[in-house]
Amino acid sequence: MVADFVAHIGKKLPDDVVAKLEELGSQETAALPKALYETMTKNQKLAVELNRPSCQDTGVLQFWLKCGTNFPYINELEGLLKEAVVQATFAAPLRHNSVETFDEYNTKKNVGKGTPTVWWDIVPNSDKCEIYAYMAGGGCTLPGKAMVLMPGAGYEGITDFVLDQMTSYGLNACPPLLVGVGVGTSIETAALNSK
């Protein structure tokens, strides 16, 4: 079931994103932006009709788990997710993106050391588990940047940093652009908050 879900999200954008693209496209009057919205909408429709990923770079899978301590499969969950990624890679098919960096080879299964990435939120005395999946391709993560600002920079410093990144590096990102901004006490916390 999880493998089917992973394959599905590689082919279909969330309904709210599709609706927003159609809404923005209908409001656009300039020729080039209107053509871009039409292309994204057509691409999404074709991906669903042809049962193919909507992007060639389906990314490296990341999972966020909100899992109860009494969930019956808590001990097997990471292994099950890894196996689901392998199955989805061949069934969808998803592009083989997972590379063992220092060994310099592609696993061809989208799994490897630390891949897929799994973040845990453990809920005491619960037997429920929620799984959130995200495909982080190079086109969306390439322009990502983290920075430690001086405490006195305040909201203005954050705003300046975000706008500078969007105008400098956002040009290289794949549309539609969804900007995540995380503010935290460390770079690691801020990066996770931005997701």
Regions found by a protein language model. Give the residues of each.
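Non-transmembrane, aqueous-exposed alpha-helical and coiled segments at domain scale
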Residues: 1-195
